[in-house]
């Protein structure tokens, strides 16, 4: 209860200071930032599941591009010395989107349109496609692709999940080539209670990786960052299933212990405090434990 009250007050102060000029409360209790002239701006959001926690340091640069660094924490992968801070923690700035190809070309000239928080971080951007900064021979910059990124922790698995939806905004068909990427890191064995840990940052793409999208059509692929110890195996993520599980968890939290007042800012601050207090419960070897 004490943590819930503390989070409630903190989020209320945040909403009061920043919400009027940047974040707008939506009918579904989420908050959304429609990107205008108030950039650059940077912030962070902490989220968690039973076996992973993350701090997403995100923002919009002065040129309208998205900025992201992920801090990922695995509370059950213990490091040495095994004290209260001994969770395996790593930062990642890998750009899975940079490997995507549209008509054999990369995406250029990103302009972030909106950022939404609702227990997930959702970013909607528009891109051009072309040779020189999105143009051929100095042609006009015309948005061709809408890209929606969603970042969220798995509810019950040791991984951070990412969901990418590519939509054709143009009038002509485009060929989209999805990337197969897998990067593996191995920690030093003398730094872990259980020896060396394996970290994997990879895209999640089905058997088909080339798609022809007509006007208004879209395709979705995923990515994940996970870690495991000896005796465990790498997970094969189902990003859509993980997305649904996270959504269901948020809905359950928001529908229980509701706070109603004439002030929508108070109601929203309480709703987000409930998420943070409920999600930071980890499934340790000694049972469920509420993280600090």
Language-model-derived ranges and their functions:
Residues 16-19, 160, 276, 290:
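Generic hydrophobic/packing signal
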Residues 1-21:
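Bacterial Sec-dependent N-terminal signal peptides
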Residues 3, 149, 246, 274-276:
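Basic side chains
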Residues 10, 14, 255-258, 264, ...:
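Intrinsic disorder/low-complexity segments
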Residues 19-269:
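Terminal accessory carbohydrate-recognition/targeting modules of carbohydrate-active enzymes
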Residues 131, 260-292:
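Extended glycan-interaction surfaces of carbohydrate-active proteins
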